[in-house]
């Protein structure tokens, strides 16, 4: 929105709500630290791709395949139980194992069986339209609900577009051609490999 204060123009601002588990935000099951077995253990979880060791990003795990960091967003790092850490780590490991296989997009055994594909497609479309330089790598969320409701991995919601729509002096994001998903800089904030695999899937 464009902000004016007492008739004085103050610029363009992007207003966004914080990402959190809530019936009116990310509507997944509440996961308490004592829920460590059965269906209760399967959700809900919110993971975030972002810089490690900054702000609330002080707990998580690294991918066994490309080393990228999955930050715990919900439950928080100081609230997640060991069994819950083991569960979500194994779920992501199983997902990534499918994604590195040559048959990752097989209708019967591929990633479509454990992901909400539409949410990943929506995420890619929105990130590409906004040319958000942080896309896929930073301020990017995925979540998993409890199995008895919908245990598939889901992308989103989209968040933090302050470097979108050409409002950035790197990554050539001001250009109206080309694909942002092909921008993957070196330096510790790489895009995890499976975004490219989803992009390539016909």
State each model region's role.
Residues 1-202:
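Phosphate/dinucleotide-binding and metal-coordinating scaffold of catalytic cores
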């Amino acid at each position: 929105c464009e902000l004016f204060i007492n008739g004085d123009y103050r610029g363009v601002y992007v207003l966004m709500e914080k990402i959190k588990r809530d019936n009116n935000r990310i509507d997944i099951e509440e996961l308490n630290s004592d829920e460590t077995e059965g269906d209760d253990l399967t959700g809900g979880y919110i993971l975030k791709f972002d810089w490690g060791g900054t702000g609330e990003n002080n707990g998580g795990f690294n991918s066994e395949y490309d080393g990228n960091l999955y930050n715990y967003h919900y439950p928080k790092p100081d609230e997640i139980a060991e069994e819950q850490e083991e569960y979500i780590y194994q779920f992501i490991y199983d997902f990534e194992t499918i994604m590195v296989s040559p048959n990752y997009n097989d209708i019967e055994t591929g990633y479509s069986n454990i992901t909400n594909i539409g949410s990943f497609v929506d995420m890619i479309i929105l990130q590409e339209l906004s040319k958000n330089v942080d896309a896929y790598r930073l301020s990017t969320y995925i979540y998993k609900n409890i199995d008895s409701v919908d245990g598939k991995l889901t992308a989103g919601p989209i968040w933090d577009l302050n470097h979108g729509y050409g409002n950035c002096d790197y990554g050539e994001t001001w250009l109206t051609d080309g694909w942002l998903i092909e921008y993957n800089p070196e330096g510790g904030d790489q895009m995890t490999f499976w975004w490219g695999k989803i992009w390539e899937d016909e």
